[in-house]
A protein has these predicted regions:
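Internal, well-ordered domain-core segments that constitute the primary functional module
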Residues: 212-279
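Extended amphipathic alpha-helical segments with heptad-repeat/coiled-coil character used for oligomerization
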Residues: 251, 259, 263-330
Length: 455
């Protein structure tokens, strides 16, 4: 068994876990302060692992003075940046890390203790290969370039990578990047807007645009995103995983766009933080969410608590995937009155996306729920297109959604097999044939439902 579960720092994740022998023992005395235990059973060539969660060991983490009092906003902000800077590279599992937030935090301190030049080159390779979530890296890279000089070989490498990046799904390329979600969309849009502005006279071959054209393309997309959120609210509302990502993208828009767009992005950011503050109850965020993960079981341990701790240093903190490293170089001001929203009694409801969220909280309890679809029901208009190019990306293979797909359009449910993932008896030729059949079927159903031809 081992206590290793998830390391925030990829440098530590690469170190082999320490395994303790339990063979022949009827009971084991587990260490305090270790909330996760992974047990491994080996029989011949078979290996079975299971992670056990020790709920009583999962407790809030506070950053307070020795006398128990809270640090000031500015003091706490520096502590947050220091925690992020001390992590070499945010772990994305056991194979690689995303270092840009950590590098930004270290630049804030003029900290040269880690090999950030090597990390930058590794990061540029991930962007060039278009890893899923490489838009996160690109967004951070743009922030870096706006604040810190680069010269020589690094400057040339960055330019090559940025010119050849794929900034939206209708551009040339096939990769594992996810474009579809609310946070990813804004990341790509603002990256296109800013990258084009940085190289106005250069040609971006995947976009088939000059930098000046790409800037206008991205700017238009950012405006559409802001229009949508201002009118309908967030679709990933109150998501304690993704609000940190959206925060980072929004402050890039705040910091690196023209004044009118910057002002609108700041207002949307204010709204997002106000919603989270309203649903903060005592030591955690208690809310229905547009996208949710298992961490919701522990409200004090959710990613967005990094944002709430920034606002109110008395609250527990989390690492929040290091996203607040972006804030170290931002001029976005945290709005007044958010701590009051956290602490005051309230009984209210509000709409966001396709949901109406209800909340009642006081000193004794917090109750919250969601109605979806909400009343009144409103939905944006589809683009008036007759034809749309669709790029189906590799990420779906990893999510298994292209092994068994359920299409529920016009009351029809079609369950189909579209790849060989986990089905080794199918030959590649047969799997490809099935995949083509699926695409034709999907195209016909899509055309019937929308009047659009799917190419």
């Amino acid at each position: 068994y081992t206590y290793r579960y998830h390391e925030e720092d990829f440098a530590k994740a690469k170190i082999p876990a320490v395994w303790y022998q339990a063979e022949g023992k009827n009971e084991i005395l587990l260490e305090n302060g270790q909330p996760y235990v992974t047990v491994k059973v080996v029989s011949g060539k078979l290996e079975l692992k299971r992670v056990f969660e020790r709920t009583e060991q999962l407790v809030p983490k506070y950053a307070l003075r020795e006398d128990g009092s809270a640090f000031s906003f500015e003091e706490n902000k520096e502590l947050i940046f220091r925690r992020i800077a001390d992590v070499m590279s945010e772990s994305r599992g056991e194979k690689f890390g995303f270092p840009i937030s950590n590098i930004l935090a270290r630049k804030h301190f003029n900290d040269n203790s880690m090999d950030d030049e090597r990390l930058m080159y590794e990061m540029l390779e991930m962007i060039e290969e278009r890893y899923d979530c490489s838009d996160f890296l690109m967004c951070g890279l743009i922030r870096y370039l706006h604040n810190y000089p680069v010269e020589g070989a690094m400057k040339k490498r960055i330019k090559d990578v940025m010119l050849n990046y794929r900034y939206w799904m209708d551009m040339d390329g096939f990769d594992g990047m996810c474009f579809w979600s609310e946070n990813h969309a804004l990341m790509f849009y603002t990256c296109a807007m800013n990258a084009g502005e940085m190289y106005p006279d250069e040609y971006f071959p995947r976009a088939k645009m000059t930098g000046r054209e790409l800037h206008l393309y991205g700017r238009n997309k950012v405006l559409q995103w802001l229009d949508d959120v201002e009118e309908y609210g967030f679709e990933e509302f109150l998501s304690t995983v993704y609000m940190c990502v959206t925060f980072a993208a929004l402050i890039n828009v705040v910091d690196y766009s023209e004044p009118e767009i910057s002002k609108r992005a700041a207002a949307v950011t204010d709204k997002m933080l106000s919603m989270l503050a309203l649903h903060t109850y005592k030591t955690g965020i208690v809310a229905p969410m547009g996208r949710v993960y298992r961490s919701v079981l522990y409200p004090f341990d959710q990613g967005a608590m990094a944002l709430m701790n920034l606002i109110n240093p008395k609250l527990p903190y989390t690492f929040g995937e290091g996203w607040l490293g972006f804030y170290a170089s931002s001029h976005y001001p945290i709005p007044e009155g958010l701590v009051k929203l956290m602490e005051d009694d309230v009984e209210t409801n509000h709409t966001t996306g396709n949901a109406r969220v209800y909340l009642e909280k006081n000193d004794d309890y917090c109750l919250t729920s969601v109605a979806s679809p909400r009343e009144p029901f409103t939905r944006w208009e589809n683009e008036p297109l007759r034809k749309m190019w669709i790029s189906r990306h590799i990420t779906l293979r990893n999510h298994l959604t292209n092994v068994f797909m359920a299409l529920h359009i016009l009351g029809q449910v079609h369950t189909v097999i579209s790849s060989t993932c986990g089905m080794q008896r199918l030959t590649a030729k047969r799997a490809f044939s099935l995949h083509i059949q699926v695409l034709h079927q999907r195209r016909a159903i899509c055309a019937q439902a929308t009047g659009m031809e799917m190419v």
